[in-house]
């Protein structure tokens, strides 16, 4: 019998793949995403789908905004995916494909498609996935899947997701069509949006601190380089 990989196994693999240190403010983001993906990957009811992939990519990209050095971000993302035995390129490609589909559709058509009220021909694979989700009583819902749905709506019509009434109605329609809990979906997305706001605020504070620190260093350097006049005899 094959032993299930543990969270410790996944973390060990990640840090073997990405050996550079991760900035403190982002380490929690990376580890929480990695643990969430790990727990899903070992769940018997979980199966990969492109909406989940879009949620993973969106979560990583949004919460890693401002990360320095910038060149390390793709290495970190790749290591997260490989640590849970997934292909990072598949996640990126599926996410880009779904965003392009969402951008090409009026939001009402997108909601009707996601809720399976209408079957559109834009993406046969996504259509098959949506049908499979709607007909699977054991579908493993996740916060990352919810973020994928939210991102699709956001890509189709950014104004809709900013309007609470329209956003709530769209999510309820989609949840009903896919047989998901609309209460769980809404709560997960409220938490996601709240955490994004907190991260934005934390980054702003950090940027202010760095600016203040840089100004102090410049002042010290300027003072050190200013010649001291000899005392008058």
UniProtKB/Swiss-Prot annotation:
One of its GO terms (biological process) is photosystem II assembly. One of its GO terms (cellular component) is plasma membrane-derived thylakoid photosystem II. Residues 213-233 are annotated as: Disordered. Pfam families: ThylakoidFormat. Keywords: Coiled coil. InterPro entries: Thf1. Residues 183-205 form a coiled coil. Disulfide bonds: none annotated. May be involved in photosynthetic membrane biogenesis. PANTHER family: PROTEIN THYLAKOID FORMATION 1, CHLOROPLASTIC. Belongs to the THF1 family. This is Protein Thf1.
């Amino acid at each position: 019998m094959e032993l299930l990989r543990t969270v410790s196994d996944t973390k060990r693999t990640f840090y073997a793949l990405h050996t550079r240190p991760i900035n403190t403010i982002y380490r929690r983001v990376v580890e929480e995403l990695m643990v969430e993906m790990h727990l899903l990957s070992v769940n018997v009811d979980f199966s990969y789908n492109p909406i989940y992939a879009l949620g993973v990519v969106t979560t990583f990209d949004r919460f890693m905004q401002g990360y320095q050095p910038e060149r390390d971000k793709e290495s970190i993302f790749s290591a997260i995916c490989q640590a849970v035995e997934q292909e990072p390129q598949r996640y990126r490609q599926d996410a880009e494909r779904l965003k392009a589909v969402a951008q090409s559709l009026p939001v009402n058509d997108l909601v009707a498609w996601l809720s399976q009220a209408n079957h559109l021909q834009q993406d046969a694979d996504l259509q098959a996935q949506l049908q499979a989700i709607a007909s699977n009583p054991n579908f493993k819902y996740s916060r990352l899947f919810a973020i994928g749905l939210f991102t699709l709506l956001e890509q189709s019509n950014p104004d809709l997701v900013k309007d609470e009434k329209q956003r709530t109605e769209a999510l309820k329609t989609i949840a009903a069509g896919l047989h998901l809990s609309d209460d769980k979906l809404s709560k997960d997305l409220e938490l996601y949006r709240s955490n994004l706001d907190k991260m934005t605020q934390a980054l702003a504070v950090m940027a202010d601190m760095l600016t203040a620190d840089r100004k102090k260093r410049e002042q010290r350097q300027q003072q050190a380089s200013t010649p001291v006049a000899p005392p008058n005899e």
